[in-house]
From Swiss-Prot:
The gene is rplI. InterPro entries: Ribosomal_bL9, Ribosomal_bL9/RNase_H1_N, Ribosomal_bL9_bac/chp, Ribosomal_bL9_C, Ribosomal_bL9_C_sf, Ribosomal_bL9_N, Ribosomal_bL9_N_sf. It comes from the Bacteria. One of its GO terms (biological process) is translation. This is Large ribosomal subunit protein bL9.
Amino acid sequence: MKLILTAAVENLGVAGDIVEVKNGYGRNLLLPRGLAIVATPGAEKQIEGIKRAQEAREIRDLDHAREVKAALEALEGVTIAVRTSESGKLFGSVKTDDIVDAVKAAGGPNLDKRAIVLPKNLVKTTGKYQVEAKLTDGIVSRVKFEVVAA
């Protein structure tokens, strides 16, 4: 099935790309969610409009991402208070939502929880940590925080 993407789809493409996908993937996921439209000659005109809008959005996003990166790197005192055992192990682990809330509480910028990249070994003990926040393609900021016992 030949489709035109209307939004960025991970491992497939960005808005405006013409892609060939299996029929079930197109009919059951991409089309119902509005992530793609069926490729027709008339739809190619829509591609031009989507690409123009995307270029303008990328310029705005790039400037905004640079501002957010500077704010995150200047941010200090981000702490996350969680319940722990006597040995310092957490009951559960620190999640991206917790990091976003802590950054916001410390006076930092609003982040999307999907931008935070947690390490393979999840945060399960108290201490100081550093994670990456992927703001846009090519702009990655480091977020430093400390996990303390509540």
